[in-house]
Curated annotation (Swiss-Prot):
Cell wall formation. This is UDP-N-acetylmuramate--L-alanine ligase. ATP binds at residues 118-124. The lineage of its organism: Bacteria, Bacillati, Bacillota, Clostridia, Eubacteriales. SUPFAM superfamilies: MurCD N-terminal domain, MurD-like peptide ligases, catalytic domain, MurD-like peptide ligases, peptide-binding domain. Pfam families: Mur_ligase, Mur_ligase_C, Mur_ligase_M. The keyword Lipid metabolism does not apply. Belongs to the MurCDEF family. Keywords: ATP-binding, Cell cycle, Cell division, Cell shape, Cell wall biogenesis/degradation, Cytoplasm, Ligase, Nucleotide-binding, Peptidoglycan synthesis. It comes from Clostridium botulinum (strain Okra / Type B1). Pathway: Cell wall biogenesis; peptidoglycan biosynthesis. Its EC number is 6.3.2.8. The keyword Cell wall biogenesis/degradation applies. One of its GO terms (cellular component) is cytoplasm.
Length: 458
């Protein structure tokens, strides 16, 4: 690990938006290496409290006074240019670096950077691969976009040359990285508040491919038509995977009673080994194939790959079992794109239940608007849909789109759908309507998980 880009280990580094999952991980890596760290966020959280316990100075709220001792300021893509700390930094000529630039510079200190990209499945695949790498004793540094029990959080600092991280395409952040193994899980239309269209997104992934050195590897889902159209851009070793085609394939797939897949891993029509997943759905078979390809490319032993995959029971907010109440199961999932919702509901359909309630909170106005037609078609596997208001995240409500409009379209299609403005009202509706043996599935990237927790903690 090298921090040459920071120049001086005595420098004080301030993070604007330190409570974010990636920013907090970067701060924790620096704290581990004895840097002086501060950060600000709009709200206190378990993440900010954990950083405080590790020695960071935490400010709640953004104020210009927060950056007075900073030598370098790191900020996220969600921070606006009129943020008082950004303004103060520019006035005082304090060096500014966005999160992606900072992470990219950090990656320069490692030889084997594994950057996992794709519209869907990044956190799960990064987490699954982390299990494999730890079983293989490669002592990796890990930065993941969710909480992973095996590392007791979202970051692990190792002493080897292996660095495993997610590579998000939003605002082309992943083009600032230095992958030795670059992974593309899938390509879909998303982040259309930044990209013009799907072709623009594919162009960004094409540029990502070109970042991989000649002796490095591209690991890609070969059955994704959007990936197929750009894979020829690779000037490195290429490993593809899939169910029916690819260098590495999953054959003889069977699902257990909880929709978890068992399958043979096949290369050149020869069985390498078999694995049994402990996470549900076809999409996780594909995620595991990506992890297996990376393990094979990194010369990890078959037994370590198998043990790593089979020891993975998921991450927080990815088809996470929250608990049971009166024999009613509550599961939470981070899905917020129509493709992800379809995959989650497909997995949930195989899960034992009588009636499935899907409680969905749309995430951002721009995504809800640009993918509106797809959102009207992705809930068919739910017996009943409950819609919360749109979670704004970084956006402002312009009045163009709302959850009631989505609810109206779902009802027009003959689906049972109810809209609510308040979480308390959703909870009360579930109390009245969910019966013995039913499944409540909370879905969305915002704070809809709170509904399930409210229900369980009655």
């Amino acid at each position: 690990m090298s921090f040459d880009f920071i120049k001086d280990k005595n420098k004080h580094i301030h993070f604007i938006g330190i409570g974010g999952i990636s920013m907090s991980g970067l701060a924790e890596i620096l704290l581990y290496n004895n840097f002086s760290i501060s950060g600000s966020d709009m709200n206190s959280s378990p993440i900010t409290e954990k950083l405080k316990d590790k020695g960071a100075k935490i400010y709640i709220g953004h104020k210009k006074e927060n950056v007075k001792n900073a030598d370098l300021i790191v900020y996220t893509a969600a921070i606006a240019s009129d943020n008082p700390e950004i303004i103060e930094a520019k006035e005082k000529n304090i060096k500014l670096m966005d999160r992606a630039d900072f992470l990219g510079n950090l990656m320069k200190g490692y030889k084997y950077n594994i950057a996992i990209s794709g519209t869907h499945g990044k956190t799960t695949t990064t987490s699954m691969l982390s299990h494999v790498a730890l079983k293989a004793n490669v002592d990796p540094t890990i930065l993941v976009g969710g909480n992973l029990d095996i590392i007791n959080g979202n970051v692990r600092v190792g002493e080897s040359d292996f660095f495993i991280t997610e590579a998000c395409e939003y605002k082309s952040s992943f083009l600032k990285f230095f992958p030795y193994i670059g992974v593309i899980l899938n390509i879909d239309a998303d982040h259309l508040d930044y990209y013009k269209d799907l072709d623009d997104i594919k162009n960004a992934f094409s540029k990502f491919i070109k970042l991989i050195p000649k002796d490095g590897y591209l690991v890609a889902y070969g059955e994704d038509k959007n990936i197929q159209s750009i894979i020829k851009e690779a000037n490195c070793n290429v490993i593809t995977y899939g169910i029916n085609s690819g260098d590495i394939q999953a054959h003889n797939i069977e699902y257990d009673e909880k929709a978890c897949g068992n399958f043979d891993v096949v290369k050149d029509n020869q069985k390498l080994f078999s694995v049994k997943l402990n996470v549900p759905g076809k999409h996780n078979i594909l995620n595991s194939l990506a992890s297996i390809c990376i393990g094979l490319a990194s010369d990890m032993k078959d037994k370590d790959i198998i043990e790593g995959i089979e020891s993975f029971f998921g991450t927080h907010r990815r088809f996470e079992l929250k608990g049971c109440k009166n024999n009613i199961t509550v599961i939470d999932d981070y899905a917020h794109h129509p493709t992800e919702i379809s995959a989650t509901l497909d997995a949930a359909k195989k899960y034992p239940h009588n009636k499935m309630f899907c409680v969905f909170q749309p995430h951002t106005y721009s995504r809800t608007l640009t993918l509106f037609d797809d959102f009207t078609k992705c809930f068919d596997n739910a017996d009943e849909i409950i819609l919360a208001d749109i979670y704004a995240a970084r956006e402002k409500d312009t009045g163009i789109i709302n959850s009631n409009m989505l609810g109206d379209k779902l009802r027009e299609r003959g689906l049972k759908c109810t809209n609510f403005h308040k979480f308390d009202d959703i909870k009360n509706y579930l109390i009245e309507n969910a019966k013995d043996g039913d499944l409540i599935l909370t879905v969305g990237a915002g704070d809809i998980y709170k509904v399930g927790e409210m229900y369980i903690n009655l």
